[in-house]
Amino acid sequence: MLNIVIFGAPGSGKGTQSERIVEKYGINHISTGDVLRAEIKNGTELGKTAKGYIDQGQLIPDELMIDILASVFDSFKDSKGVIFDGFPRTIAQAEALKKMLAERGQDVSVMLDLEVPEDELMVRLIKRGKDSGRADDNEETIKKRLHVYHSQTSPLIDWYKNEKKYQHINGLGTMDGIFADICEAVDKL
């Protein structure tokens, strides 16, 4: 089973490239945001618990997030694989994901890191904000999001390098060129 973690700052193209990976390799996409919204909408026990944290303005604990991801992952048992988008974000989450997968005889196949320089991310996100009207894509908020991303991710990149799962992907260039680099990395697995 192909288990991919896709990684990159806001605006790096994770969503676009995830869609293409899903289409080419016939694997399922797990976006933590989408999964949380679905669990809450469907009124599952996990969703109700998560909603309680969200309603109180609290972060969802890693253990609960892993339980939710495990439930979704298990629903894909006949799948060729999964791409994890938006998770893990911390070393504790990466360790929890590794444990959850190991309990199922699986492991992360590769962590794809879409690297884009910060000045280009700003240009992309400001354009996206204008095009989509997303309130969280204004310059001040973007800078905060990028700071949080960089402060959380440096240790995680090193963690995946130590696990021998890290793959750098240059996130500059055409969508097709970036996707070709991703395919080259995935096809080697």
Swiss-Prot record:
Disulfide linkages recorded for this protein, renumbered to the chain, are none
Q: What is its EC number?
A: 2.7.4.3
- PROSITE patterns documented for this protein: ADENYLATE_KINASE
EC class? transferase
UniProt feature coiled coil, ranges: none
Q: Under the cellular component aspect of Gene Ontology, which terms does the record hold?
A: cytoplasm; cytosol
Positions of the UniProt region annotated as LID: 127-137
> Where is the protein found, in the record's own terms?
Cytoplasm
Q: Which reaction does it catalyse?
A: AMP + ATP = 2 ADP
PANTHER family in the record: NUCLEOTIDE KINASE
The UniProt function text for this chain reads: Catalyzes the reversible transfer of the terminal phosphate group between ATP and AMP. Plays an important role in cellular energy homeostasis and in adenine nucleotide metabolism.
**HAMAP family documented for this protein:** Adenylate_kinase_Adk
Which family does the record claim for this protein?
Belongs to the adenylate kinase family.
**UniProt protein name:** Adenylate kinase
Which organism does this sequence originate in? Answer: Bacteroides thetaiotaomicron (strain ATCC 29148 / DSM 2079 / JCM 5827 / CCUG 10774 / NCTC 10582 / VPI-5482 / E50)
The gene behind this protein is adk
